[in-house]
Amino acid sequence: MNNIPKMKIGIVAVSRDCFPESLSVNRRKALVDAYAAKYDAADIYECPVCIVESEIHMVQALEDVKAAGCNALCVYLGNFGPEISETLLAKHFDGPKMFVAAAEETQENLIQGRGDAYCGMLNASYNLALRNIGAYIPEYPVGDADDCADMIHEFLPIARAIYGLNNLKIISFGPRPLNFLACNAPIKQLYNVGVEIEENSELDLFEAFNKHAGDERIPDVVKDMERELGEGNKKPEILEKLAQYELTLLDWVDEHKGYRKYVAIAGKCWPAFQTQFGFVPCYVNSRLTGRGIPVSCEVDIYGVLSEFIGTCVSEDAVTLLDINNSVPKDMYKESIDGRFDYKHTDTFMGFHCGNTCSSKVCNPQMKYQMIMARSLPIEVTNGTLEGDIVPGDITFYRLQSTADCKIRAYVAQGEVLPVATRSFGSIGVFAIKEMGRFYRHVLIEKNYPHHGAVAFGHYGKALFEVFKYIGVPVEDINYNQPASLPYKTENPFC
């Protein structure tokens, strides 16, 4: 993963002037020791400045964490805390921030050793609101050193995603395909969440591709593809063109990222791509996504934005799939019913033509795009990476500016079942509790497109917090609600 941030969280303790400063300082030291004992000490930095009711201390702490290379901040209330200067620190720190508070350690020290940070967190939240400052506050933000170490560690993937978004450029090629309004992408919300976008024509990409013909690096890329594919290299004749295309994209990224640190690509793949380029780009998309540079299909700008968020959160390859087809009843009865605790309507197949990273596919093979080959010569549709998706935990999610130009998101945890799909493409049998109701009352009701991002693991907790942090209204962050919790649009008589 070479396209995601490495985070360093500066821990700044704060203290109310009528409380012992030593209480905050000693608790900060205990917190830092606890983190180093449980996690990677390189994730954090202990700021030696304790802010005590002083805007001057605030400036000193701010300059110190900047000088230490911190790109995220933890304001630690070691006692009640100075509500003005602690929130000013958050205001002036340019990066993701969180607030946590110290719990009282023992019943034997509740006179001089009582810090009242439980109370101070309330005033901190009030002051954050007064100054319109966004910050991550854990579900229960008060704890001892071990508890707070865990909270900071849980903040890491959230901070990675937020910092990544604020330094991301999406590069797109071409408008979405004809008759494909579902990938409509109102760009205003991209800017609202801190993302830049560079929109190019497909012709620009084609010109750059042609200029890479005969590039001296192509043979080495072909060898790398051959190593990756192994026995799945069923289309060796197309690898040279695919390598040429991969180098085209990578060079474009290097030349066009500008002042941004991270890049994601929304690429075109039909209808003219195959006939002009002479292949489909699915395999190249999968390779770049596996390195942390997500490449979406069908110029899905919010799809690749979602993929990038998942890459930052999981530090792993993700994919983008169609919420594609139902599981046949005979397949459900034969392979799922009685073996797994899912209803038939909890299951569906997630599919795309061949864009999923080889590490996430069972026995991956290079093939051709069967759907396109129904109307085109097979030789111009080569380039898909196909196979059943590896079974295991997944999170299906998406951030989207919908048709009304509002920003919404959904998150649903589930799994890919170890059930043979008996089909083609990058495909898997997915199971999500109460998927049928979620499909109707979230995906359909709120006008989501058919593409969903997939992270390989359960990352719902972090993704939910990322969406909250970047300003998605909480009423528009949906999940697969249990049967005991009806959706607002759900018919109570069904």
Task: Show which residues each predicted segment covers.
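Periplasmic-binding protein-like
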Residues: 70-79, 98-100, 262-267
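Short, well-structured alpha-helical segments in soluble
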Residues: 57-70, 87-89, 248-258
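Extended hydrophobic packing segments that form well-structured cores
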Residues: 370-494
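Long, internal scaffold/assembly segments composed of regular secondary structure
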Residues: 222-313
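Short, acidic/small-residue loops that bind anionic groups at enzyme active sites
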Residues: 88-115, 122-127, 286-299
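Cap/lid and interdomain-hinge subdomains that line or gate substrate/regulatory clefts
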Residues: 2-9, 43, 105-233
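C-terminal catalytic subdomain
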Residues: 289-422
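N-terminal basic/disordered segments at the start of proteins
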Residues: 1-37
